[in-house]
Structure formats: C-alpha cells, structure tokens
Regions:
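Active-site PLP attachment segment
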Residues: 36, 42-77
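PLP-dependent enzyme catalytic core of the Aspartate aminotransferase-like
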Residues: 161-164, 173-208
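AMP-binding (ANL) adenylation modules
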Residues: 93, 148, 171-176
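A short glycine-threonine-serine/GTX helix/turn-capping micro-motif
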Residues: 65, 82-91
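Short hydrophobic/aromatic beta-strand micro-patches
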Residues: 69, 143-147, 184-186
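Active-site core of PLP-dependent enzymes with the aminotransferase class I/II
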Residues: 1-19, 151-152, 192-193
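Conserved PLP-dependent catalytic core of the aminotransferase class-I/II
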Residues: 97-165
C-alpha cells in the first residue's frame, strides 16, 4: 500500500536459519526495481535459491494476470497442487502477448526506469519542500500522511477539483489516525506534469 521496501536480506537469513522458503510478493517491484527491472530481489542482489517470487502483470507491465517464478521443482509442484492455479482461467492470448512485449520494453529501455526514478526524486523533494509528511519515498508510490479521515477526504476532493487524481486511503485499509493521500509516479510524467501537480498540492495548503 505504501510502496515501502521490506528488509528482504534479513528476512531471507531467518528463513534459511529455519530451513524455510521465502515467498516474495513483488507486485510493485517488477519492472521498477533493480538494474534490469527484475524486481526487489535484484535490487538487493539476492540469489533466488529457495525463494519464490510472485507478482502481477497489471502494474508496470500494463497487462492482466500474474506470475510465479522460482526453482523448477517448486514451480512444478505448485503447478500440479495449487488449487489457485489448477482452478483458474488461463489469461487471454492478447494479455499474454502484451505482457511479453512489456517485458521486452523493460529489458531494452532502461532509460524509462531512470526517468521514473528521476520523477520520484523530483516529486518527493517538491512535496517535502511544501511541508507535506511523506510516509515512504523508496518507490514510485508516495503516500502523503494526513491523519484524520475528514481532512484526508477534503484534500482528495480539492486535488480532484484541481485536476489531480490522488485517492484517499482510510481505515480499515490503514490504521486509525493514519489516513493518507496515495500518489503514484510513472516514467511518462513530464517535469511540467509534476510542477502542475505540486501547484495543486500547494494551493490546497493555502485553502486549508
């Protein structure tokens, strides 16, 4: 929800110590983290032995469906035993083709990833410069802490009126008293887009 990174190397140490497997849900990491966009495991430089990585094809890759990657024996076991796989519907061919094409873009166009992280740095710096409290700034998901539900909804409405879609996230999705505005960046946002969005946040500060 907040785009924050867990201490995966430390967690992997614990699983190895107890002869357990580690399952990493990398829904927001695929295509974004790592030198080649392989996700959180690549970001931390971790080996994939006794680690399963799962994720979605619907975020950075812009398609539908999901994936599970790991040692062949483990994947084959799940392919034959996991009810969630056995009883699911196969993805449409067009979605599979779109996901494969997106993976090629991830591999061949690292400039898109660099541009994304430049946008993250520009955006977080701008919000903090305005005095907003950021819960996390380690990913393209940047949540802005507000606190109360009423104040958060009011801010979301004001931003929408200014032409900016930034959803309000409230309990029970997050703990009481920690409602927030969830902002998300892409590599396609221009410097002008970010300046306009920061202007909307600044205007909302003046209104409040």
């Amino acid at each position: 929800m907040d785009g924050d990174l867990p201490p995966l190397p430390r967690i992997a140490e614990i699983t190895r110590r107890h002869d357990a497997w580690l399952l990493v849900d990398d829904a927001h990491g695929t295509g974004v983290f790592g030198e080649e966009g392989r996700g959180s495991l690549e970001h931390f430089g971790m080996e994939t032995k006794e680690i399963l990585q799962m994720g979605t094809l619907s975020k950075a890759l812009g398609s539908q469906g999901g994936y599970l990657a790991g040692p062949r024996a483990a994947v084959e076991l799940l392919r034959n035993r996991a009810r969630s796989f056995i009883y699911t519907t196969a993805p449409a061919p067009a979605c599979s083709a779109a996901a494969l094409a997106a993976l090629q873009v991830v591999r061949r166009e690292p400039d898109l990833r660099r541009r994304l992280w430049e946008n993250v740095r520009r955006w977080t710096s701008g919000l903090e410069g305005l005095g907003y409290d950021l819960i996390s700034k380690s990913s393209p998901i940047v949540p802005v802490r507000v606190g109360g539900n009423r104040e958060t909804m009011a801010l979301a409405r004001s931003l929408e009126e200014a032409g900016l879609y930034a959803p309000a996230i409230r309990p029970p999705t997050v703990p009481e008293g920690s409602a927030r505005i969830r902002t998300s960046l892409t590599s396609l946002h221009t410097a002008g887009d970010l300046e306009e969005a920061l202007g909307a946040f600044k205007k909302c500060l003046q209104i409040s």
